[in-house]
């Protein structure tokens, strides 16, 4: 990827030109100063634009660096997984290259054979490739399933953690809701108590207001009554006082008139006083009869104008003056008394006026108080109405709040019940998911153990197949030697026939010489143990471990691998179409049919040619050879047995089998790389056979076919691919004759001694308890 700083460089000139045009296009009022702070405006704008781009680039680079740091851990994990996958791929490629090399070698060998055998080998190779592809697909599917299961486990774990978090949040929310519900309940209780107190206070206030209204009405009525009574009393008093005032005014006027008269009389008397000083003594004597004098004075006063006599009149005047003096004194006393009464009346009048004024002021104050009380009564009534309305509104609000809180409480209880149901469902789902996770983990462990055991079994099979291939190669070398021996016999018989055709009398001599040297009863050169027929373990067992045996058969005593797919377990023919071994000895056949101890006459009879135009009968052809590696005995099979033709050597080797079997059981896994080690002894054996001999091809070796056996301790499935057809895939059919390598009519098959003891082939292998079956996909 290119650097981000290199991208804006080619466009910098264009940006500067555009900026210059934009600045030139601006009006003079909007143009910046020519030299802001001593710099031209274009440089400032360019620096600002460059700084903006630099900031953007810095932010982009910082974002990329942070993103790359976040991806470091992921890349490391992916690198680790990729390294593991690459290592597995390298191993698989190495195995594939080795298998391909072997397959090319097998193809080279098979190209030397007939087209039919090539077709059979190709079909088998295709079937094996198909099975390999199926197995690889199944392996990939299993890996995908394992990855999916791991992803499911991770998802389940994440879901489990999320559900735990949700449970914690839900528990917290439940606790908060419980606290809120408790607080709401306490608030509701407080509100109920407050409502009750408000109701009680309202009732008390209503009762107090009613009492106050009743008292106010009673006070008003009593005030009116008292006011009326006082007004009536004061009206009566005022009327009486008015009457007294009138009387007092009349008495005052009369007293004033009397005073005026008396003043006038006093003035007259004062005028007559000097005249009456002389007559004082006389007047002192006449004090006794005052009343009569007064009456007389009065009468004289009335008739004073009629007095004609002056001396008598003077006496009378003196008497009258004394009487007047006494009357004046009494009048002055009365006057003083009247003045005192008048003063008292004035005082009482003033007091009454003051009392009236006080009553008027009290009346005004009472009226003002009445007005004030009426206004206060109205205000209190208005307040009462307002308070009743306010309390009603508060009561309605509180009732609404109570209804809302009750509804909210009911909703919260419903939500709590729903949340509890959800929590119960979540706990049930958690338990089910935990059980599923445990089941998945157990299934994963089982599948891992199963595939590990299956890999071990496949490795054991591969090792057994490798051992079978080694034994097959040895058998090939033995068969080539047999073919060479049979060819030698054929050449000798041809020479014998030529001698018989030339000189029939030389039969006895040639029979004695030839029979002694080449009698079938004579020991075969193949019967002697050689270095090539000895036990041939794998290179790994030669270096590290003891002789490793085939662990496939549970108790079989064969001397070869237990695979029924072994190509040498079927019929193997030579170049002349004849089998490289005699017909197997049937336990129901006669001993003379074996051909191993037959006389030369019987051999000559068997070599009779059929008439021209007829083919060989089927009875002359040997039957299909049974597997010589299986046995009904309970000895383990393995390639470590010597290929000797004496039973004593076989029994000797069988004694050492249990120790090898125990060593093979102790080894759980075999290295797959050791399965592809080439055998250095094969070229020597192939060269020993001589040129001109075409070895039969080695078909790919298939594993043992295990049928389903429900009686065993473990249920076993059938094989993942069908068994090979008899006599066609691994060997030529009975009607097949390969081309002859010498001219002349074909000869009848002659009897030959079988180098291996006859052994029966069981139709099915017994199930092995330590083996798990192949999974069905």
UniProtKB/Swiss-Prot annotation:
Keywords: Coiled coil, Membrane, Transmembrane, Transmembrane helix. Residues 530-541 have a biased composition (Polar residues). It is a single-pass membrane protein. InterPro entries: cTAGE_MIA/OTOR. Residues 510-688, 721-742 are annotated as: Disordered. Residues 118-269, 339-494 form a coiled coil. Residues 572-591, 649-672 have a biased composition (Basic and acidic residues). Belongs to the cTAGE family. This is cTAGE family member 9. It comes from Homo sapiens (Human). The lineage of its organism: Eukaryota, Metazoa, Chordata, Craniata, Vertebrata.
């Amino acid at each position: 990827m290119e650097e981000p700083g290199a991208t804006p460089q080619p466009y910098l000139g264009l940006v500067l030109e555009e900026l210059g045009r934009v600045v030139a296009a601006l009006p003079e009022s909007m143009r910046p100063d020519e030299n802001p702070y001593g710099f031209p405006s274009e440089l400032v704008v360019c620096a600002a634009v460059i700084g903006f781009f630099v900031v953007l680039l810095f932010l982009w680079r910082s974002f990329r660096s942070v993103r790359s740091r976040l991806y470091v851990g992921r890349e490391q994990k992916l690198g680790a997984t990729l390294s593991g996958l690459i290592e597995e791929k390298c191993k698989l490629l190495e195995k594939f290259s080795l298998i391909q090399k072997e397959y090319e070698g097998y193809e080279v060998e098979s190209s030397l054979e007939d087209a039919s055998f090539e077709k059979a080998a190709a079909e088998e190779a295709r079937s094996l490739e198909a099975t390999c592809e199926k197995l690889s697909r199944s392996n990939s599917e299993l890996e995908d399933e394992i990855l999916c299961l791991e992803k499911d486990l991770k998802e389940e774990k994440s879901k489990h953690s999320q559900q735990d978090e949700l449970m914690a949040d839900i528990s917290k929310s439940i606790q908060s809701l419980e606290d809120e519900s408790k607080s709401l309940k306490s608030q509701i209780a407080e509100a109920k108590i407050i409502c009750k107190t408000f109701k009680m206070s309202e009732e008390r206030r209503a009762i107090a207001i009613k009492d106050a209204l009743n008292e106010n009405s009673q006070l008003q009525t009593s005030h009116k009554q008292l006011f009326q009574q006082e007004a009536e009393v004061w009206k009566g008093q005022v009327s009486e006082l008015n009457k007294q005032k009138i009387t007092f005014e009349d008495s005052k006027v009369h007293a004033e008139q009397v005073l005026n008269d008396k003043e006038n009389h006093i003035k007259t008397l004062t005028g007559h006083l000097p005249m009456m000083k002389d007559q004082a003594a006389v007047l002192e004597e006449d004090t006794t009869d005052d009343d009569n004098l007064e009456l007389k004075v009065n009468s004289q006063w009335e008739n004073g104008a009629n007095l004609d006599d002056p001396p008598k009149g003077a006496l009378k005047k003196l008497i009258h003056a004394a009487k007047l003096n006494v009357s004046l004194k009494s009048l002055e006393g009365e006057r003083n008394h009247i003045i005192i009464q008048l003063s008292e009346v004035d005082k009482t009048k003033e007091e009454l006026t003051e009392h009236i004024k006080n009553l008027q002021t009290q009346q005004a104050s009472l009226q003002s108080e009445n007005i004030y009380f009426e206004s206060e009564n109205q205000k209190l009534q208005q307040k009462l109405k307002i308070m009743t309305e306010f309390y009603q509104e508060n009561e309605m609000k509180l009732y609404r709040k109570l209804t809302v809180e009750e509804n909210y409480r009911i909703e919260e209880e419903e939500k709590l019940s729903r949340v509890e149901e959800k929590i119960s469902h979540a706990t049930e789902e958690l338990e089910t998911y935990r059980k599923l996770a445990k089941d998945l983990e157990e299934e994963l462990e089982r599948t891992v153990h199963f595939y590990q055991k299956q890999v071990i079994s496949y490795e054991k099979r591969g090792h057994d197949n490798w051992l079978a291939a080694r034994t097959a190669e040895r058998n090939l070398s033995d068969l080539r030697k047999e073919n060479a021996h049979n060819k030698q016999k054929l050449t000798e018989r041809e020479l014998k026939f030529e001698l018989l055709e030339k000189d029939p009398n030389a039969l006895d001599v040639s029979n004695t010489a030839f029979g002694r040297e080449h009698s079938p009863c004579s020991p075969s050169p193949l019967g002697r143990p050689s270095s090539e027929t000895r036990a041939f373990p794998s290179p790994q067992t030669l270096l590290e471990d003891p002789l490793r045996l085939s662990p496939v058969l549970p108790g079989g005593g064969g001397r070869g691998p237990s695979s029924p797919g072994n190509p040498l377990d079927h019929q193997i023919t030579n170049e002349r179409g004849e089998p490289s071994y005699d017909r197997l000895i049937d336990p129901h056949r006669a001993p003379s049919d074996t051909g191993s101890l037959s006389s030369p006459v019987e051999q000559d009879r068997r070599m009779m040619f059929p008439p021209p135009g007829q083919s060989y009968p089927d009875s002359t052809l040997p039957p299909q050879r049974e597997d010589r590696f299986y046995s009904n005995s309970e000895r383990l099979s393995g390639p470590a047995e010597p290929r000797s033709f004496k039973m004593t050597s076989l029994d000797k080797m069988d004694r050492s089998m249990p120790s090898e079997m125990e060593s093979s059981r102790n080894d759980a896994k075999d290295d797959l790389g050791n399965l592809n080690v080439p055998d250095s002894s094969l070229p020597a054996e192939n060269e020993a056979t001589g040129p001109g001999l075409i070895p039969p091809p080695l078909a790919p070796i298939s594993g043992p076919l295990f049928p389903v056996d429900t009686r065993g301790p473990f249920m076993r499935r059938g094989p993942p691919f069908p068994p090979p057809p008899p006599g066609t895939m691994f060997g030529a059919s009975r009607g097949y004759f390969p081309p002859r390598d010498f001219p002349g009519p074909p000869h009848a098959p002659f009897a030959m001694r079988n180098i291996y003891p006859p052994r029966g082939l069981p139709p099915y292998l017994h199930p092995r308890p330590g083996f798990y079956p192949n999974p069905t996909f």
